[in-house]
């Protein structure tokens, strides 16, 4: 092991030891498999959102020349959630997202899970036929997509 690897391992061990912010603990999942997780992190998105809400005007997201505070992110996500409810989306319904990584993806995700719906992320590298196939099989009631991903889906009508 070279010196830089030793240094990385030493720093990692210091950050992940008991009592540190990135403390790692082992747990056994429902299949009996042992896994590792951060001990001090929230165990639900709701708790994470509650924690994040305490940071109001601090930067939540910086994307190219755009800046969003935590307050901005929650305000936009709430609008997304309200629009979903107005569109008839209910708790447990599936809503897909197919777009490049950008702020809108994050706000759509937060809005979806914020109302208790299930987010079905689709691969943004897919072409129209692949997106269509996924939508026909995931039971999404609605899809968020950017212009590039929506191209070729104009005539898409999925009914079950």
Language-model segments: residues:
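Structural core segment of the AMP-binding/adenylate-forming
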Residues: 1-20, 86-87, 114-160
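Short, charged, surface-exposed hinge/linker loops at domain edges
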Residues: 12-37
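Short linear motifs at secondary-structure transitions and domain/linker junctions
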Residues: 34-44, 71-73, 117-120, 139-145
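Conserved AMP-binding/adenylate-forming core of the ANL superfamily
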Residues: 36-46, 57-110, 127-132
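Intrinsically disordered, low-complexity boundary segments flanking structured domains
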Residues: 47-50, 154
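Flexible acidic/glycine-rich loop/turn elements at helix↔coil and beta-strand↔loop transitions
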Residues: 50-56
